Regions:
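Membrane-embedded helix-loop-helix hairpins and adjacent transmembrane boundary segments
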Residues: 344-719, 741-880
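Low-complexity, intrinsically disordered or signal/transmembrane-proximal segments
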Residues: 194-195, 726, 744
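Kelch-like beta-propeller repeat domains
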Residues: 9-349
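Intrinsically disordered, low-complexity proline-rich tandem-repeat tracts
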Residues: 191-192, 718, 728
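Glycine-biased, low-complexity coil/linker segments
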Residues: 3-4, 205-208, 720-721, 737-739, ...
Length: 880
């Protein structure tokens, strides 16, 4: 065994140990616990039972520990580690091709090393198709989760290289074939121009060619790429296999033919290395689009049987680095060369794109300043916009707020990786609009509340209001962090600016803009931002469709339909009640529940209901948002499908170092769109982000000022937040500042300070999130939504529809509902979309049962659906 140490200039190879026995053609994988060495052969005939872990002890000394051996001894096979398993498949068993595959849960339990019991290899379904000798193996993320990929190899029985790969999906316990290993010939023709002509094979012609992966090595790269280094030429290799077979087959030999074969063998073994056409190009496989490409060409990696080791890059160096060690430079001739390969994607934002983006940001800051004078001395203006917002603007504002960068980037990324199975959730927004308008909106408008949680105090008690408001604030801070992180990730990918600088800039600009002008600036900012982001999405969708393949829209449609990219519902007849995957009923239930939560208990949305002049206008705004969600979101799913079709027909255009799948859309913006248009779309990402963050910060400051600070400083309990001039049902209501016994200027000052603090805290959490590996931020967001806010929606459902439920039963039901989703998240495999639904159902059912023992004692005039038209109580409900 050899090791290398020291810096790049002083690195020296050192002999550090020897293996327990001399073996060749085994497999080794690197794990956090050390190097696992498996199988091999000592004589080229018999496969050996061999499995050891090589690691260092506390003193830094190398140690060898025995591991469970494979169920069958193997050589010339491939192994890989990832997602808690070591996989092994293919190869030979005592000279016989093997189609069996195995995996071992890793790391092993400590008891194994003490008792040699408690761990064993698990046999997987048999490999599909022919046997695979000398394949390459990698564990890499696919469209949904990680898979075990076994690519290439050859079947000695048919003397043919295997033309494709296969991958094992652990979620379905099944193998699936990849596309054929074919690529377009490098246009530069470097490869053929520097290689000696061969009388045995003809030169490649223009077009696609088949490639074999025999004698190659592979490593994962980024979020969804597999890089294949080296390997033999398919046609030369297959002719060599056939020649060897004929030399060993005595039934077809004649003296003349035998002499001819020996002459060909001599000629074959005595050529210069370039004649053999060992692969000089880096062959890249993309797991999502199932496509192959060659990305660069170098004679330094033209070896077969080399080891490829990823290395950690120093700060500021290449995005991906690997060492190509040893191998053969030609058949029978080993190489001691070591080549370092550095790969990086470099993006330049450009002055024109910066100009577009800066103009947009300055415009948003000016908008906040414009409304600052109108909101600075009036709490009614700051929190409700004075009731001056038109219904259509309120609807667009709700849409822009709920859209966010999560939709703008993650939905295209989700549709790009999978299909349209999440689209029915958008239809659920429109469906939920009708019960929200009929059953919920009247309470928020007629009670003249400033925050949604004031209703909970009137219906239950102040403890319920405070708890719900605090949880809302916690959730909004988490959401702020997430939607800060997403565009910062995009900007880092497309400009190279440090992600932490991006987060800080985004947060500070947004804090300045939203705390200056209050909710009116936020709403009109949402309108402008909504126009920008919708226009940008339509432009991107059209560009992707037109530029797919050679025939534009027809290729887009053909590829998308061939790969089932428009599928709306996932249904498995064998598992109709599958609650792990995003099946049709999981998406529908989750969409209805999560949207009901957002549109009935989310202060950022409910605050928009209160900015219009009357209840009818608010209802129109809600319907406007529902219709926009159904129609406009089609553009975002079309973008995702377009990204798939575009990059499947242009696989070499992908960034093989892209670490986050959610960055695919901004990467497309900067790598494919002309300057200026790319800046406009990046501005649209900023617009989606700022509309959401501004609403979050404004609603946090409202909830804190009204529900927390206002309660502490109140001299009289507020009946609502209307200003001196606004009336409700003919009765004047005091302003918020008057209601809590302080001036309006002081109230607005507290609200601004609360908004600044919330924004800074969200910024800090976003910086922490930048260090976490999250494959799908859309999934992550919906998980947080279900965990933190589901049972709050249950509280409003209890209050409005179940007059028998009192405060004690409601609180216990709330905690039971919250506990149920934490149990689902940490102890089951239930899909995150179900969390909100389960939380609502459990909280309401528990509260109903407990209401038998703790019924609501007092009547609730005007606070339940049954008594909506009754006169309101003169003061909020106290403690039970």
């Amino acid at each position: 065994m050899l090791g290398v140490g020291g810096g790049s200039a002083s690195a020296q190879w050192q002999r550090i140990s020897s293996l327990p026995c001399a073996l060749a053609y085994g497999a080794s994988v690197t794990t956090p616990e050390g190097i696992v060495c498996l199988g091999g052969t000592s004589n080229g005939q018999k496969s050996e039972d061999f499995a050891v872990l090589l690691s260092t002890d506390k003193n830094g000394q190398l140690q060898s520990q025995n591991l469970p051996v494979l169920p069958v001894s193997l050589d010339n096979f491939a192994a890989a580690y990832g997602d808690g398993y070591i996989y092994a498949a293919g190869g030979l068993h005592n000279g016989i091709p093997n189609r069996r595959a195995f995996r071992l849960h890793w790391p092993l339990p400590t008891a194994w090393f003490e008792t040699q019991t408690g761990a064993a290899w698990e046999e997987l379904p048999q490999l599909p198709g022919p046997a695979r000798v000398q394949p390459v193996a990698v564990v890499q993320k696919g469209a949904i989760g990680s898979n075990f990929y076994l690519l290439g190899g050859y079947d000695p029985r048919y003397r043919k290289a295997v033309a494709n790969g296969a991958f094992y999906d652990p979620r379905k316990n099944n193998w699936y074939a990849t596309s054929l290993i074919t690529t377009k010939i490098l246009s530069s023709k470097e490869s053929s121009s520097q290689q000696a002509p061969s009388p045995i094979v003809s030169p490649d012609e223009e077009g696609e060619r088949e490639i074999c992966l025999v004698g190659a090595s592979a490593i994962p790269s980024g979020a969804a790429h597999i890089l294949c280094f080296g390997g033999v030429d398919k046609r030369i290799f297959e002719q060599a296999l056939d020649r060897n077979y004929q030399l060993s087959d005595t039934t077809i030999q004649t003296a003349v033919r035998l002499a001819q074969l020996r002459e060909e063998m001599y000629y074959y073994m005595t050529q210069v290395p370039s004649w053999y056409r060992f692969r000089r190009s880096l062959l890249v496989y993309h797991t999502i689009t199932d496509s192959w490409a060659e990305v660069f060409d170098s004679p330094l990696i033209a070896r077969a049987g080399a080891a490829v080791v990823p290395v950690t890059s120093a700060a500021g160096s290449a995005s991906l680095s690997a060492l190509v060690i040893g191998g053969e430079e030609k058949p029978g001739v080993r190489s001691s060369d070591v080549t370092r390969v550095d790969i990086a994607y470099t993006a330049h934002f450009g002055w024109l794109n910066w100009t577009v983006l800066i103009l947009y940001l300055l415009g948003m800051v000016y908008l906040g300043y414009y409304f600052m004078k109108r909101a600075s001395n009036s709490s009614e203006d700051f929190f409700k916009g004075g009731g001056r917002i038109p219904w259509w603007a309120a609807g667009i504002s709700i849409f822009a707020t709920m859209l966010s960068a999560i939709t703008y980037m993650s939905i295209p990324a989700k549709a790009y990786a999978t299909d349209w199975t999440y689209y029915p959730m958008q239809i659920c927004i429109l469906l939920v609009s009708f019960p929200v308008i009929k059953y919920y909106l009247p309470f928020f408008r007629r009670l003249n509340v400033t925050t949604a949680y004031e209703y909970l105090e009137r219906r239950f008690n102040s403890a319920t209001r405070l708890m719900a408001s605090v949880l809302f604030i916690v959730f909004m801070i988490a959401r702020t962090a997430l939607v800060l992180f997403l565009p910062s990730l995009a900007m880092t990918a497309v400009t190279g600016i440090n992600i932490y600088i991006c987060i800080a800039l985004m947060a500070l600009i947004t804090i300045l803009y939203c705390t200056m002008g209050g909710v009116e600036a936020v709403v009109w900012g949402d309108v402008i931002q909504g126009i920008i982001l919708v226009g940008g999405a339509i432009l991107a969708a059209v560009y992707l469709i037109v530029n797919t393949g050679e025939h534009g829209a027809s290729d887009f449609w053909q590829i998308a339909t061939d790969h089932d990219k428009f599928r709306l519902f996932l249904f498995d007849p064998e598992h109709p009640f599958d609650f792990v995957n995003a099946t049709w009923w999981v998406v529908i239930l989750g969409g209805l529940a999560n949207n009901l939560i957002s549109y009935t208990s989310d202060q950022t949305v409910i605050q928009r209901y209160l900015t219009t002049s009357d209840e009818k206008s608010a209802a129109r705004g809600i319907l406007t948002n529902g219709l926009m969600s159904v129609v406009v979101t089609i553009a975002f799913f079309t973008i995702g499908t377009g990204l798939y079709t575009f990059f499947q027909t242009h696989p070499a255009e992908l960034d093989i170092t892209m670490a986050k799948s959610d960055a695919i859309f901004p990467f497309f913006m900067m790598s494919q769109l002309p300057a200026g248009l790319a800046g406009l779309l990046i501005a649209a990402v900023f617009a989606a982000t700022m509309s959401t963050i501004a609403s979050n910060i404004n609603s946090i400051s409202t909830a804190f000022t009204v529900d927390l600070w206002g309660k502490v400083h109140s001299r009289t309990l507020p009946k609502g937040g209307a200003s001196d001039s606004q009336t409700t049902s003919g009765n004047e209501s005091p302003s918020l500042g008057e209601a809590i016994g302080v001036g309006q200027a002081s109230t607005v000052k507290v609200a601004r300070i609360a908004g600044i603090c919330a924004g800074l805290l969200g910024m800090a959490i976003a910086c922490l999130m930048a260090t976490v590996d999250i494959q799908s931020l859309l999934d992550y967001f919906n998980t947080i939504l279900g965990l933190l806010s589901g049972a709050i929606g249950g509280l409003f459902l209890m209050g409005i529809f179940f007059p028998r439920i009192g405060s004690r039963a409601a609180l216990v039901g709330f905690f039971c509902g919250t506990a149920s989703v934490f149990y689902l998240n940490f102890c089951t495999q239930a899909n995150f979309l179900l969390f909100g639904f389960v939380s609502i159902v459990v909280s309401v059912l528990v509260a109903l049962v407990l209401s038998i023992f703790w019924p609501q004692k007092d009547e609730q005039p005007g606070l339940t659906w049954q008594t909506l038209e009754s006169p309101l109580p003169t003061s909020p409900k106290g403690e039970e």
